[in-house]
Amino acid sequence: MASTASYSPSPTSQWRTQKLPKRFNFYVIHNQEFGKLSQSSSLPTSSFPKTLKLPVIQMPINNNIQSQTTVCVSTDENLEELVNLQKIANGVLTKESNKRVFIQDPPWVSSLFMNSLFVRAKQVQGVRREFREIERRRRYAMLRRRQIKAETEAWEQMVEEYRELEREMCEKKLAPNLPYVKKLLLGWFEPLRQAIEKEQNAETTVKHRAAFAPHIDSLPADKMAVIVMHKLMGLLMMGGKEERCVQVVQAAVQIGMAVENEVRIHNFLEKTKKLQKHMTGAQSQEDMSRETMILRKRVKSLIKRNRVVEVRKLMKSEEPESWGRDTQAKLGCRLLELLTETAYVQPPVDQSADTPPDIRPAFRHVFRIATRDPGKSIVKKYGVIECDPLVVAGVDRTVKQMMIPYVPMLVPPKKWRGYDKGGYLFLPSYLMRTHGSRRQQDAVRSVPTKQMQQVYEALDTLGSTKWRVNKRILSVVESIWAGGGNIAGLVDRKDVPIPELHSDDIMEVKKWKWRVRKSKKINQELHSQRCDTELKLSVARKLKDEEGFYYPHNLDFRGRAYPMHPHLNHLSSDLCRGILEFAEGRPLGKSGLRWLKIHLASLYAGGIEKLCYDARLAFVENHIDDILDSANNPLNGNRWWLNAEDPFQCLAACINLSEALKSSSPHTVFSHLPIHQDGSCNGLQHYAALGRDSMEAAAVNLVAGDKPADVYTEIALRVDHIIRGDSIKDPATDPNALLAKLLIDQVDRKLVKQTVMTSVYGVTYVGAREQIKRRLEEKGLIDDDRLLFTASCYAAKVTLAALGELFQAARGTMTWLGDCAKVIASENQPVRWTTPLGLPVVQPYFKTQRHVIRTSLQVLALQREGDTVEVRKQRTAFPPNFVHSLDGSHMMMTAVACRDAGLQFAGVHDSFWTHACDVDQMNRILREKFVELYSMPILEDLLESFQNSYPALTFPPLPKRGDFDLVEVLESPYFFN
């Protein structure tokens, strides 16, 4: 058989053919054979091309030919058309009886071939898409099973772990290799389990059990023991005002709640086990209800559940009434009492064999004196569970063994559909953090679903953002932490030394006691910070190998969104923000590379963040070598990144930029880094938009400018000017003169920033004083505590006065809001309003009522929401709460719009995040939504709602509004930057 040649038809060539029959096979011959064939055939020579170019496609000619002759026919550039194909076939086949005819590449044949190829490719692509979809569903189902197991079997797994450790200890003596905390918990587990089991089996009267240990037998003793130990240790790690202790009422209620939640799941599983066990042969699956089948499958294998929604409905329909805080506290107290009786620690010191070991209780129940009321002889006491210093030391070193509830989810959260419908698959999830305010709960529950739809969508959008752990940053953090911390903002892992007394002088002893108190307080704060860091790192370690995870969000009562997981989240510290990144990567693009550089400069801060964009870009270009060195050698190089205000986020940006700069095509490098766009003193931005004041709008970047306006620097300059003026006055006539001299050259942006930031949220004089005092302490230029206090008082007054001068319109709006709240609260009514997105808000400030209950441990005084409003709190809290509800609305509106535009979005109140390549689009959206929000008659609607709700009351008139045009916000490059 001859070889194949190629042919490219002339543009002018045309084919006219007859439809050819099927079932013909053709072969290709060489040019020489074709020439011989043409000479021996009856075909004219001009009918054949001068140069033979044969395609791969083969065509049949005639289905009634007996013999086979092969003839190759092609077009030539000088040939206009071929002779009729039937004539060719007849002529050839009469001369050569054993040959066939082969037809070469007409356009319609090529079209058929390409069309067939295209159809085939589409089929292959479709199959691939189907396989990808099948794989996606398979992986989702696997992750969903893991998530359900994590939510429902956590305590069960901990119990099994303790049992396994006990077996290994007996067989292999593994105790010396266990972490310290694990040793403690393992040592407490069996005695506590036995004590609980004994309590469960005790022949006590129903009345006695109801009074002191209700529901003590509602869970297996081993599971209850694990819950008590871990909840108490978790509370101790969270830290608080007290050193090495936690209040009994707090611990008891928390433990009672944890037991109740586990009881619901446990009872549900036990019930389905009994259903399965007592099924007779006659009771086939067909006879069972759909619900029973689901229950049985769930018990048989939690991992294989696929009907989570139906199961939750069944659980909810069969749930008993909530225990209530009284019952929770009673049970919690009894379990705490059993723990204090059975848990012991032994100091790790060498002791002689003939000396009994120094074993002492790990926990003690003691009473402490509350702050005495002046002029009253009654001393108030409260009970605490105090832990031994050895327990604190162990907790300080490691918390890897602690079980943390509400960890980030492996699958997207359930969409919100109601007050308690959404978030985690099985763990109790509530739309709003009401902190026990029944009025707020009732308000949210009573609102139609349609009215809340925008809020639900926003929370779903925030919860659908997929995150992952930045392993390179985590590795750097772990290295620093293992080395003792104390750099890059990490807390020092060593306590400050307690000063020793070297004199018997009364004054020296007094000073020594004060220094000891101060050192202990510092160490207490360090301990709390170390526990917090360990909690964050423990979650990061657990999630570092996951492809991605999600944060279910809910709201505070004002409508601000928060992740439900409290430790490792993007609302937290620089440590958390540096460790977290988007799971999805997107190419930087030209604009993304620019924004990455701007982002890096802003994170470095030190005043760089207040420069124009071009200056920030120039800063990065001038430090390229430092950036590359930081990325390549973060701990052993020149460590430039450590000088940044947000060091870990800065390092993450250095690494991302380094990857781009090393690439031959920087714009195509994928980036997972969230790029921030932050509001400029966002509370004042909202007040400026409400009041339409042009001067205030310019001060907070609602108006376009060549560089960002810095309101903090502006206030600092005003404060410095006032202080310098006071410093030249006569101290005999003006007592502030000496304080002013003391503060010269100490006033800067940092000194006043927090006070300015919180002024719009209703900061009081006392609050401002404490904020400024902390900044002055950090400077360390005033040693005397009394002098530091008086200087802080003076600086706070001056700062608030400067604020009042610059933001008069904002003060007017704040005053109007406060006056309206006072009118309402004077009628013993809480202030209520509805946010622009339809969320009802009720201020939860009521005088509390004390409710005393007797427990086995002590008498507890539980506080409940009363019926009398706190007038002062209702008035002072309303302005900041109202503005918070507005900034929450702006963030949620932006989140939904970004989702609709295909952007990944994360929000931190007044800081919006997305991929570098999408920053320009997000900037446009957030400005449009701000203008849309404040184009609504917000204050007018608020006043109308007050008048409709309280027609008998008289409210002050609306504050005057300025002439600022909101449209200018759309053109302001530094509104968010």
From Swiss-Prot:
EC number: 2.7.7.6
Tissue localization of expression: The highest levels of expression are detected in the mature leaves.
InterPro entries attached to this UniProt entry: DNA-dir_RNA_pol_helix_hairp_sf (IPR024075), DNA-dir_Rpol_C_phage-type (IPR046950), DNA-dir_Rpol_phage-type (IPR002092), DNA/RNA_pol_sf (IPR043502), RNA_POL_N_sf (IPR037159), RPOL_N (IPR029262)
Gene3D superfamilies in UniProt: 1.10.287.260, 1.10.287.280, 5' to 3' exonuclease, C-terminal subdomain, DNA-directed RNA polymerase, N-terminal domain
Compartmental location: Plastid, Chloroplast
Active site (UniProt): 678, 753, 910
GO CC annotations, alphabetized: chloroplast; mitochondrial DNA-directed RNA polymerase complex; plastid
Pfam families cross-referenced by the UniProt entry: RNA_pol, RPOL_N
GO molecular function: DNA binding; DNA-directed RNA polymerase activity
Recorded catalytic activity of this chain's protein: RNA(n) + a ribonucleoside 5'-triphosphate = RNA(n+1) + diphosphate
Biological processes, Gene Ontology terms: mitochondrial transcription
Keywords: Chloroplast, DNA-directed RNA polymerase, Nucleotidyltransferase, Plastid, Transcription, Transferase, Transit peptide
Transit peptide, from-to: 1-72
Principal place of residence: plastid
Function: DNA-dependent RNA polymerase catalyzes the transcription of DNA into RNA using the four ribonucleoside triphosphates as substrates.
Membership in a protein family: Belongs to the phage and mitochondrial RNA polymerase family.
Name this protein carries in UniProt: DNA-directed RNA polymerase 3, chloroplastic
Gene: RPOT3
